[in-house]
């Protein structure tokens, strides 16, 4: 019997590390990306038997910043995934505005990518700088225009809860709604004491204000025709993210790459977050069986 499967592929590299980011990400040294793609291909080949008994329904390339890959590296990655695409109904890649180009998006389209998740986060220049984002609002508009010409579904991310009394998040939302993406994700800013942002903020948003901000955002999104279908996700009808829903439904999802997590047949496991170990094929860091 064939089982359905979602595939997550982690590209951990970023041009610059955001001041709030606690994901598995790093700035690449010369050779890191090419070496990583080689290790990724070896890991993929190790799951041949799982792929033979599975129908892969969704592929999600996340990060990090997958759009940081140059054209040759992007082509190499997508060629790896090409044999797994035959039954895929949703193929997503994450991107940041500063690394979107027409040539890259054309390559995505040629390899079946039909959904792009774009990290905007805020349209306020001061907050972009505080968060360590390296794009501008002009770059967002340019990226959206390029993506729209070739890709069916666009998601844009927004962060709220930046500071007590802050109102810029609603301005950002209005700008996003004006771009009319099919999907919008809104995330509360999480401040970790070990990251640079913690030292840059004089005050933090309390839970009551965060709740109020979320509900303002939700109300405006609903009035603009977006339907909430998960905690942080809103879409126009028919554009709900299939891959996201696999996690909520605890459906089989294989994660490959640095720090990637998997859930297969009620067994959870995750890869090491240490690049040196991963390149040496010392991948699996933790396993556990989940009760049904």
Map each language-model feature to its residues.
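Short active-site neighborhood of thiol/selenol oxidoreductases, capturing the structured segment around
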Residues: 7-10
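Local cysteine-cluster metal-coordination motifs and their immediate loop/turn environment
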Residues: 12-25
